[in-house]
Swiss-Prot record:
Protein name (Swiss-Prot/TrEMBL): Putative cytochrome P450 135A1
Organism of this sequence: Mycobacterium tuberculosis (strain ATCC 25618 / H37Rv)
Originating gene: cyp135A1
GO cellular component: peptidoglycan-based cell wall
Positions of heme binding: 383
Family: Belongs to the cytochrome P450 family.
CDD domains reported in the protein's UniProt record: CYP110-like
Length: 449
């Protein structure tokens, strides 16, 4: 192995670094595949402020190396530094080593299988509240509707918010963060920009969100019925961390904002893309209807997983090298950020034959190998909420297709990806026309397809 090891950085484009940043942050859907075709399975980019030296890996064996590496050698918290201005320094996404393990252990009880079973009825109830308001034969912006629905769910699960006024204000302000342009996000680390719009508006909005969160934390700390509540905030307030180190308000705030933002928008985007694919695949949609009525969660989950593969919402994971490291045949210098390209891994013809086809059966026949499907990352940094997201998505699909079938409508017949903040969403909102079922489930006496 030593004879094949190359020291330094892999080849990459010689474009000006800030141009690379724009292409990477805003136009990654075509930029990354172009770089992959030109430079191969491992290549370098310069994309400040995200990373001065970014090494992109696409092959499953290299991705496995990264996910299995000692977390002391690869810091994901440092790799995510651009998110720190929103999520906060104590966020489970921003911390490393012992502090990350501590935060993860505190959050984990809220996402166990037992906890997920407890959330399921609530998810279904909220989904029905929203979907029963949809008008038959109407055309909807599915991205907007999925954002509203998943945010309502996550506010109840994470925050336990039922006050309509608090929900409305928090929803409005969180949407302002969700809709942020990548260029604004890239400018957040520069203090001189804080005095100018749109960054001034961004930080003002964040201050108002913090006021709501801290107010709710203070109120919840003195709640005599805390033990009867099952939301994540109440669980965290009841956690006995250590006698000398209870969770501070700042630590609670950072976990809450992380879960509120990361816990709904990615699922909303994945659902809107999945619905758009189903609108163009009537045979698969017919199977989804039967699965919805019959309670076949396995098939519904496979459909969602294929939607996540076909349309990658989060393009990559990042880890900063703390000391010289050997990954994928390269000895990388300290300070390099290693990037597992979820976007390119999901589009691989080797890992996913006919990758542009929407085929949920991939996830039912055992053909999807480890380290080739990566919406939730991997290793010790795998998303804590992966089980929640899959359960939520399957339940929402079930509630939709018990009542409607769908066709594509308007500009969404030619839907294209758009990078919004750090997520990739349908540019036109994935508009759908709602066709009511003849009765609940829309099924006659014929056998399922």
């Amino acid at each position: 192995m030593a004879s094949t090891l190359t020291t330094g950085l892999p080849p990459g484009p010689r474009l000006p670094r800030y141009l690379q940043s724009v292409l990477y942050l805003r136009f990654r859907e075509w930029f990354l595949p172009a770089m992959h075709r030109k430079y191969g399975d491992v290549f370098s980019l310069r994309v400040p402020p995200y990373a001065d030296n970014l090494v992109v890996y696409t092959r499953p064996e290299h991705i496995k190396e990264i996910f299995a590496a000692d977390p002391r050698s690869l810091h994901a918290g440092e790799g995510n530094h651009i998110l720190g201005f929103v999520m906060g320094e104590h966020s489970v996404l921003m911390t490393d080593e012992a502090e990350h393990a501590r935060m993860r252990s505190l959050l984990m009880p809220a996402f166990t299988r037992a906890a997920l079973r407890g959330y399921r009825d609530m998810i279904a109830s909220v989904a029905r509240e929203h979907i029963t308001r949809w008008r038959p034969h109407a055309t909807i912006n599915s991205l907007d509707h999925m954002n509203a629905l998943t945010l309502d769910i996550i506010l109840r699960v994470v925050f336990g918010v039922t006050d309509p006024k608090v929900k409305a204000e928090l929803t409005s302000r969180l949407q302002q963060i969700i809709n942020i342009h990548p260029a604004i996000l890239a400018g957040v680390p520069y203090p001189s920009l804080k005095r100018m719009n749109p960054w001034k508006r961004f930080f003002h909005n964040q201050t108002k969100i913090d006021e709501i969160l801290y107010r709710e934390i203070a109120s919840r700390r003195i709640d005599s019925d805390l033990t009867a509540r099952t939301d994540v905030l109440s669980r965290l307030l009841q956690t006995k961390d250590t006698p000398t180190k209870p969770l501070t308000d700042a630590e609670l705030r950072d976990q809450l904002i992380t879960l509120l933002l990361a816990g709904h928008e990615t699922t909303a985007a994945a659902l809107s893309w999945t619905l758009w694919e189903l609108a163009h695949a009537p045979e698969i949609q017919s199977q989804v209807v039967w699965a919805a009525v019959g309670g076949d969660d396995g098939f519904l989950e496979a459909v969602l997983k294929e939607g996540m593969r076909r349309h990658t919402v989060i393009a990559s994971t990042a880890r900063k090298v703390t000391a010289p490291a050997e990954i994928g045949g390269w000895r990388l210098p300290a300070g390099t950020v290693v990037n597992t390209s979820i976007l390119l891994a999901h589009a691989s013809e080797v890992s996913h034959p006919k990758p542009t086809e929407f085929r949920p059966s991939r996830f039912l026949d055992g053909s999807v190998a480890p380290n080739t499907w990566l919406p939730f990352g991997g290793g010790v940094r795998r998303c804590l909420g992966f089980g929640f997201a899959l359960t939520e998505g399957a339940v929402i699909l079930q509630e939709i297709f018990r009542r409607f079938t769908i066709t594509a409508a308007g500009p969404s017949k030619g839907e294209t990806p758009l990078v919004r903040n750090i997520t990739t969403v349908p540019k036109h909102g994935a508009h759908l026309r709602l066709i009511p079922q003849r009765r609940l489930g829309g099924l006659g006496d014929s056998d399922p397809p």
